A protein has these predicted regions:
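Short, surface-exposed amphipathic charged segments that create phosphate/polyanion-binding patches used
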Residues: 94-103
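RNase H-like, metal-dependent nuclease domains and their acidic two-metal-ion catalytic environment used
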Residues: 1-86, 90, 94, 107-167
Length: 167
């Protein structure tokens, strides 16, 4: 199996948490799927189990969101977390939208992700755009978690690829 990454996001009203998984398929496209959605209080245990079963190369969370509460709980369980900054969140959104527009992203027609995409609105962030999480009528956590999982996969691929280093 190819390397996988996870992204996690707790909804603005804290009623749900979404965990998305991203990987690169043999044809070169990135695939992303919401693999769990449930009560935020259960998320650390679920993510720990996913970490043990799927052996991800990275897990991405925005610590400046409702998801900040996941960071310490995941660390306690030994799950490493990449904490995204504002620029990372903006890049995650832009790259995700570019992959969608170019047909290089595979998703799985999941109703919760489709609803989030249809209800999505952009907001300015770090000189670019990101998802508006607060003033929309539908839970954006599946969309945001998916963006973060894809972002983490692309960053891992950049740093793990062999290259020429100047010393």
């Amino acid at each position: 199996m190819a390397e996988v990454t996870f992204g996690a996001e707790i909804s603005e009203d804290r009623s749900l948490c979404a965990v998305a998984k991203a990987w690169r398929e043999a044809n070169g496209r990135i695939a992303v799927k919401v693999v769990w959605r449930g009560a935020p209080v259960l998320a650390p245990d679920v993510m720990d189990a996913l970490y043990m079963s799927d052996d991800p190369v990275d897990t991405a969370v925005d610590p400046r969101s409702q998801s900040a509460t996941l960071c310490a709980k995941l660390a306690e369980r030994g799950v490493p977390v990449r904490r995204l900054g504002p620029e990372d969140v903006a890049v995650a959104h832009g790259e995700f939208m570019d992959l969608v527009a170019s047909g290089r992203l595979k998703h799985f027609e999941q109703p919760e992700l489709t609803a989030a995409v249809r209800g999505a609105q952009a907001r300015p962030l770090a000189g670019a755009q990101a998802l508006e999480r607060r003033r929309v009528g539908v839970d954006q956590s599946p969309f945001t978690a998916s963006e973060f999982a894809v972002w983490a996969l692309q960053r891992w691929e950049e740093t793990s690829s062999p290259g020429v280093y100047v010393v």
